[in-house]
C-alpha cells in the first residue's frame, strides 16, 4: 500500500507526541513511559502501511520496551545491594517505591525506595548508618533505572524518526 502525505504527517505527529509522552512518563511515572513509544511506533507503522516502520523495527522497539520496564526494579535492587542492603532492604526498596508512587505521585517512588530500604533494614536490626546507606543505594539505583529508560526512549526516537524520514 502506498503511503499518502496525510498518513505520513499523521505518523510523524503520533511519533513526536508518543515520544514526548514517553519521555515525561519515564521521569513522571504516573504517566505510562516507554510503552507509549512502542504504541506510537506501531501506529506509525500502520499509518505508513508498514513501509517505513516495518515489523522488524516494531519488534526491535518492543524488545527495548520490555528491557526498559525492568530498569526501575533492577536499578533499585543493584543500587541497594551495592550499598550493602540485605534481603530486607531489597524488599523494602521495591515495596517502598510502589507504595511511594501510589501515595505521593509523581516523585513518591524515589522517596519510597529510600524510605523502604532504610526502614526495612532498620527493622531487620541493621545499625542506622548501614540502613541509611542501603536507602541511599536504593535511591541512586532507582535514579539510574530512570536514566536507563530515558536512554531507551532516545534510542527509540532516533531509530523511529530515522525510519520515518526514510533513512
Name each model-derived stretch.
Residues 37-53, 95-101, 115-124:
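Interfacial segments of multi-pass membrane proteins
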Residues 1-10:
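Short, strongly hydrophobic alpha-helical membrane anchors
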Residues 2, 155-167:
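Juxtamembrane boundary at the C-terminal end of a transmembrane helix
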Residues 56-100:
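Helix-adjacent hinge/juxtasegments
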Residues 18, 22, 44-45, 64-72, ...:
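Alpha-helical transmembrane segments of multi-pass membrane proteins
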Residues 102-104, 136-151:
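Individual transmembrane alpha-helices with interfacial aromatic-anchor signatures
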Residues 19-36, 97-106:
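Transmembrane alpha-helix interface/packing and boundary motifs in multi-pass membrane proteins
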Residues 17-22, 41, 92-100, 137:
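Hydrophobic, membrane-inserted alpha-helices
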Amino acid at each position: 500500500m502506498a503511503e499518502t502525505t496525510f498518513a505520513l504527517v499523521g505518523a510523524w505527529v503520533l511519533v513526536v507526541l508518543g515520544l514526548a509522552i514517553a519521555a515525561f512518563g519515564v521521569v513522571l511515572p504516573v504517566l505510562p513511559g516507554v510503552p507509549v513509544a512502542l504504541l506510537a511506533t506501531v501506529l506509525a507503522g500502520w499509518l505508513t502501511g508498514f513501509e517505513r516502520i516495518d515489523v522488524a523495527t516494531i519488534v526491535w522497539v518492543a524488545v527495548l520496551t520490555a528491557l526498559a520496564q525492568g530498569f526501575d526494579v533492577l536499578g533499585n535492587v543493584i543500587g541497594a545491594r551495592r550499598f550493602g542492603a540485605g534481603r530486607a532492604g531489597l524488599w523494602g526498596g521495591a515495596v517502598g517505591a510502589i507504595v511511594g508512587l501510589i501515595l505521593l505521585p509523581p516523585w513518591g517512588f524515589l522517596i519510597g525506595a529510600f524510605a523502604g530500604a532504610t526502614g526495612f533494614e532498620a527493622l531487620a536490626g541493621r545499625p542506622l548508618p548501614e540502613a541509611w546507606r542501603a536507602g541511599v543505594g536504593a535511591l541512586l539505583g532507582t535514579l539510574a533505572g530512570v536514566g536507563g529508560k530515558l536512554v531507551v526512549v532516545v534510542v527509540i526516537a532516533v531509530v523511529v524518526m530515522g525510519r520515518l524520514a526514510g533513512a
